[in-house]
């Protein structure tokens, strides 16, 4: 009896294998070769290609060394928090590797002089200033399907105004129209983005929900679709000022990885954004160096390999700016200790910045 049962199981196994092979060949005949495959059959499928954010600390916090290609990214935060700066840094890093980038300026507010200071190659940057939200997303879809563009930035979701709203009267109520526009566009874009390996960065603004008694009243514009389709969501906030004597020369910025499909989320990192310069790389080297034990701190003095960098953080930053070889050595040491640094990053506060961050 046991032998008969064993033979039946073996025959079922053979039948299943044959049935699966027949199904796979039928799918490939109908939809083309490569429409279905075993994940382990191609090593390239598993690898995650990334582009640096321009911030060493944020690259480490993301867990994969930067923002992933072929994915949708959302960067949101209050006004003047550094959203566009972070997106432009990513564009500059992609261009350094020979990539082609596009900037869809729905807000009509891109400053070319500032972009150049951040390292963006303006001569090779594709820019569009569309009239309507439909036009902006159609341009984005066409660029993605071309397969020739590496990074596309949409600035911002809040400025993607539906055509019906522009053609209607001022004050006319059109509830949910922008959310429907985003939902339809993202359904179309997702498959094309994955196939073309293009990174699409959506910059978003924050709004307040009325009548919220418990939890954060903050939410992002454009409905819920972007929260679900985004592989990485970054919450960027200004937490203080960087001062040179009495003059404010930059912002202290905190970025929380609210959602991450590539690595564990909820890591957060702090860095300086200097006016006219962007992310302060030397400031990050000092802060991360101390956190990783690469840079020693005794009182107000910072030192590296028994060499004094300066008294006080600002003097240490100036020393690294004037001595790029030492800065390069520290950066190399930090990249080798990336895992250790990631563990030491503080997790985001339990209350979170958006009450719906956990849902997405």
Swiss-Prot record:
Its main location: cytoplasm. GO terms for molecular function: ATP binding; ATP hydrolysis activity; ATP-dependent DNA damage sensor activity; damaged DNA binding; single-stranded DNA binding. SUPFAM superfamilies: P-loop containing nucleoside triphosphate hydrolases, RecA protein, C-terminal domain. The keyword Metal-binding does not apply. ATP binds at residues 77-84. InterPro entries: AAA+_ATPase (IPR003593), DNA_recomb/repair_RecA (IPR013765), DNA_recomb/repair_RecA_CS (IPR020584), P-loop_NTPase (IPR027417), RecA-like_C (IPR049261), RecA-like_N (IPR049428), RecA_ATP-bd (IPR020588), RecA_C_sf (IPR023400). GO terms for biological process: DNA recombination; DNA repair; SOS response. The keyword Transit peptide does not apply. GO terms for cellular component: cytosol. It is found in: Cytoplasm. Keywords: ATP-binding, Cytoplasm, DNA damage, DNA recombination, DNA repair, DNA-binding, Nucleotide-binding, SOS response. Can catalyze the hydrolysis of ATP in the presence of single-stranded DNA, the ATP-dependent uptake of single-stranded DNA by duplex DNA, and the ATP-dependent hybridization of homologous single-stranded DNAs. It interacts with LexA causing its activation and leading to its autocatalytic cleavage. Belongs to the RecA family. HAMAP family: RecA. This is Protein RecA. It comes from Chelativorans sp. (strain BNC1).
């Amino acid at each position: 009896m046991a032998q008969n049962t064993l033979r039946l199981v073996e025959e079922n196994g053979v039948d299943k294998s044959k049935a699966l092979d027949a199904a796979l060949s039928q799918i490939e005949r109908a939809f083309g070769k490569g429409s279905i495959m075993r994940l382990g059959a191609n090593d390239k499928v598993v690898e995650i290609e990334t582009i640096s954010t321009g911030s060493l600390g944020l690259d480490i916090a993301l867990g994969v060394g930067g923002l992933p290609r072929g994915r949708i990214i959302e960067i949101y935060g209050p006004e003047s928090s550094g959203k566009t700066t972070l997106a432009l840094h990513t564009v500059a890093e992609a261009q350094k590797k020979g990539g082609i980038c596009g900037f869809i300026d729905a807000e009509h507010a891109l400053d070319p002089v500032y972009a150049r200071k951040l390292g963006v190659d303006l001569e090779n940057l594709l820019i569009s200033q569309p009239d309507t939200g439909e036009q902006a997303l159609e341009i984005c879809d066409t660029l993605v399907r071309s397969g020739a563009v590496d990074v596309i930035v949409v600035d911002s979701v809040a400025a993607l105004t539906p055509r019906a709203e522009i053609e209607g009267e001022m004050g006319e109520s059109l509830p949910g129209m922008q959310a429907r526009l985003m939902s339809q566009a993202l359904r179309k874009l997702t498959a094309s983005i994955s196939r073309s390996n293009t990174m699409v960065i959506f910059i978003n603004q924050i709004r307040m929900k009325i009548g919220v008694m418990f939890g954060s009243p903050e939410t992002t514009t454009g409905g819920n679709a972007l929260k679900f389709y985004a592989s990485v969501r970054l919450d960027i906030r200004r937490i203080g000022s960087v001062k040179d004597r009495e003059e404010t020369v930059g912002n202290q910025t905190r970025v929380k990885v609210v959602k991450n499909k590539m690595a564990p989320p909820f890591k957060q990192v702090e860095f300086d954004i200097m006016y006219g310069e962007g992310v302060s790389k030397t400031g990050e080297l000092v802060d991360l160096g101390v956190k990783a034990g690469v840079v020693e701190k005794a009182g107000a003095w910072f030192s590296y390999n028994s060499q004094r960098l300066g008294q006080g953080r600002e003097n240490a930053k100036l020393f690294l700016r004037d001595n790029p070889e030492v800065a390069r050595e520290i950066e190399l040491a930090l990249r080798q200790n990336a895992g250790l640094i990631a563990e030491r990053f503080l997790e985001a506060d339990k209350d979170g910045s958006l009450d719906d961050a956990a849902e997405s």
